[in-house]
Amino acid sequence: MVSLDPEKKNEIIKEFQIHENDTGSVEVQIALLTARIKHLTEHLRKHPKDFHSRRGLMKMIGRRRKMLKYLRHKKPEVYRELIAKLGIRK
């Protein structure tokens, strides 16, 4: 799986964390997955036959979809703010 560089990861965590020590809330996890998905999508545009990476991308998208579904049911307002901030829904 493709990982983000530590500076980019810390920047995303600081932007989406709920409190100072928050690194694992659903919002942060979704934001990190979205960044990894965008990075891997760019990779697959350059390397369209990389099917192993494509499978990893599909797994990440599925994991993000499940987390978004959970967030939509538990905290609908936070869900709407998050998708608007990330620009992942219409």
Swiss-Prot record:
Q: Which Pfam families match?
A: Ribosomal_S15
* Family to which this protein belongs: Belongs to the universal ribosomal protein uS15 family.
Under Gene Ontology molecular function, one entry of this record is:
structural constituent of ribosome
Q: Does the keyword rRNA-binding apply?
A: yes
HAMAP family reported in the protein's UniProt record: Ribosomal_uS15_B
Q: In its UniProt entry, what is this protein called?
A: Small ribosomal subunit protein uS15
Alphabetical GO biological process terms: translation
**Does the keyword field hold rRNA-binding?**
yes
Sorted alphabetically, the keyword list is:
Ribonucleoprotein, Ribosomal protein, RNA-binding, rRNA-binding
What is the documented function of this protein? One of the primary rRNA binding proteins, it binds directly to 16S rRNA where it helps nucleate assembly of the platform of the 30S subunit by binding and bridging several RNA helices of the 16S rRNA.
**Subunit composition and interactions:** Part of the 30S ribosomal subunit. Forms a bridge to the 50S subunit in the 70S ribosome, contacting the 23S rRNA.
UniProt GO cellular component terms: cytosolic small ribosomal subunit
